[in-house]
Amino acid sequence: MEKYVRIATPEDAHRLAPKVRKADIDEIKASNNITPLRGLLYPFTKLRHKTFSIIGTKEEGVIGMFGVVPCETKDFGIAWLLSSEELINHTIQFLRECPKWVEEMGQDYKYLYNYIDERNIVALKWLEFLKFKHIETLPYG
């Protein structure tokens, strides 16, 4: 795999949306009641977004998208990731590269955050691996 992560395009969102993981679909439905496509296209509506695509094999194509969008609160950025089940085929490379991309996403912000559905165990473990801190649990929905 030559280029694993690159700057995302709206076309990438259209390619990834039909194959987003069920846990991610459930999470964006619970939090914002939107479709995967709408969630993936949302960052492109923000001026200071950083949005990247994770590319698998030639057959897999786009297997994930992630990035950061500005928050209304100064110094805060909202980090996010949506992926397909195919990302599991690239776990080692994904985990190895994550810290540098989190650093890239955080360059313009003092804090990165997001809300995670507690049922999304994979996302919670990933954030724990990246040393994100759990601040509080809030009821939602």
Indicate residue ranges for each PLM-predicted region.
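A short beta-loop-alpha structural element at the N-terminal edge
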Residues: 2-18
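Conserved GNAT-fold acetyl-CoA-binding loop/helix
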Residues: 22-41
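A short helix-loop-beta-strand connector motif used in the catalytic cores of GNAT acetyltransferases and
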Residues: 41-55, 62-64, 110
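Conserved beta-strand in the GNAT
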Residues: 53, 60-71, 76-80
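Conserved acetyl-CoA binding element of GNAT-fold acetyltransferases
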Residues: 75-88, 93
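Conserved acetyl-CoA-binding loop-helix of GNAT-fold acetyltransferases
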Residues: 90-104, 125, 129
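Conserved GNAT acetyl-CoA-binding A-motif
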Residues: 106-116
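Conserved catalytic-core motifs of GNAT/GCN5-like acyltransferases
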Residues: 115, 133-141
